[in-house]
A protein has these predicted regions:
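Short secondary-structure junctions
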Residues: 26-34, 78-83
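Charged interaction segments
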Residues: 45-118
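Short, extreme N-terminal segment that most often corresponds to the first beta-strand
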Residues: 1-25
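Generic non-transmembrane alpha-helical segments
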Residues: 18-29, 72, 76
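Short edge beta-strands and adjacent turn/loop segments
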Residues: 33-48
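Generic alpha-helix signal with a bias toward terminal, lower-confidence helices
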Residues: 17-21, 38, 89
Length: 118
């Protein structure tokens, strides 16, 4: 799984701390999380882009687990693909409530062998 996060932060260190806090609920489902890249987002000052590679445990996340996890980020998200291979969480969606004010947007991409049946 690949996760790209856009977070409000003042430094790399702060962005990593926010990222770890936000993703603490995913630890139950992962064998390994690794930050691949972190940098200020060139389009918007005050936002950092963090990219993570995540190795899921042998059992894929089922729909119930996924929904429970997503509800820790926001009340609304978009999913793409059949079966689902991408999820978008963004404060730009009408009615969206982010449960961490530091989140601007999160993209979650699922590996082909770990795709969720919808």
């Amino acid at each position: 799984m690949f996760i790209r996060m856009f977070l409000y932060a003042k430094s790399n260190k702060e962005a990593v701390g926010i990222c770890n806090d936000i993703l603490s609920n995913i630890d139950l489902y992962t064998e390994k999380k690794e930050i691949v890249e972190i940098a200020p987002y060139w389009k918007i000052e005050g936002i950092f882009q963090i990219e993570l590679s995540v190795v899921l445990k042998s059992n894929s996340i089922d729909n119930e687990d996924l929904e429970r996890l997503l509800k820790t980020f926001s009340n609304i998200w978009l999913s793409y693909g059949q079966p689902i291979d991408e999820i978008l969480i963004t404060r730009k969606l009408d009615g969206s409530i982010m449960y961490n004010e530091k989140i601007e947007m999160i993209n979650i991409f699922f590996d082909s062998e770990k795709i969720i049946a919808s």
